[in-house]
Design a protein with these regions (language model features):
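Proline/glycine-rich low-complexity loops and linkers
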Residues: 1-19
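Acidic, glycine-rich active-site loops and adjacent beta-strand->loop/helix elements
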Residues: 8-11, 49, 154-157
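Carboxylate- and glycine-rich phosphate/diphosphate-binding segment that chelates Mg2+/Mn2+
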Residues: 16-125
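A general structural signal for well-ordered alpha-helical segments in protein cores
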Residues: 63, 90, 130, 149-150, ...
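Short helix-capping/linker segments at secondary-structure and domain boundaries
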Residues: 73-79, 125-127, 159-166, 207
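Gly/Pro-rich interdomain helix-loop hinge
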Residues: 140-213
Length: 213
């Protein structure tokens, strides 16, 4: 059956991926399914369809999209084409999410594009342990998926840092951090993590799991 998708949030990129999630409420489980028949034949990505999202949902889905982009950029399967998608998505989402939370037309439009580009990237290379941990958190505690991602992401970035080469310099630069070319490895890695924390804080995401479980 052909699928025509009309996304109403800017985060999951379900309209351009072959992944979907089934929640088993009785067993408190979330199951990630992959099916090539799940991908839509046409996606109508219209930011006006997302304008009714409340601030909290906008923030959560936006941080989900940023997590897609960052995890996709540093995953083992990353390569030149996926890197192009993910870096551009990081750049767009980082500058647009604050405005989208305030429901500005420009922020909504850019978030619609940024999350879509992130989906184009990660659907080709996969994600990482942030999503692996966020799914059971959501299943067990009913934590919004994007909120769980946003809280876990900085810690996982710190853990993964030794295996990422100079990619955190690229992430920091894409997120608007100045002077990254003159930073040491430790400095630009910290700058990338701090930029993620700052964005999450600015859009009202809790800083710690203790606040949500």
């Amino acid at each position: 059956v052909p699928i025509f998708a009309v996304p109403t949030t800017a985060g999951t990129a379900a309209e351009v991926t072959i992944n979907y999630v089934i929640t088993d409420a009785e067993k408190n489980r979330k199951m990630v399914c992959v099916d090539v028949h799940d991908i839509p034949v046409v996606a109508f990505v219209d930011p006006d369809m997302m304008s009714s999202m409340p601030k909290g949902l906008t923030a959560a889905t936006g941080m989900d999209a940023l997590t897609h982009a960052i995890e996709g950029y540093i995953t083992k399967g990353a390569w030149e084409l996926s890197d192009m998608f993910h870096l551009k998505a990081i750049e767009i989402i980082s500058r647009a999410l604050r405005g989208a939370v305030e429901n500005t037309p420009e922020g909504r439009e850019e978030m619609a594009l940024g999350q879509y580009i992130a989906g184009m990237g990660f659907s080709n290379v996969g994600l990482g342990i942030v999503h692996s941990m966020a799914h059971p958190l959501g299943a067990l505690y009913d934590t919004p998926h994007g909120v769980a991602n946003a809280i876990i992401l900085p810690t996982v970035m710190e853990y993964n840092a030794p295996a990422t080469g100079e990619k955190y310099r690229d992430i920091a630069k894409a997120m608007g951090v100045k002077g990254t070319d003159d930073m040491t490895q430790d400095e630009y890695r910290k700058a990338a993590v701090d930029a993620v924390k700052r964005l999450a804080s600015d859009v009202g995401i809790p800083a710690d799991l203790k606040e949500i479980v």
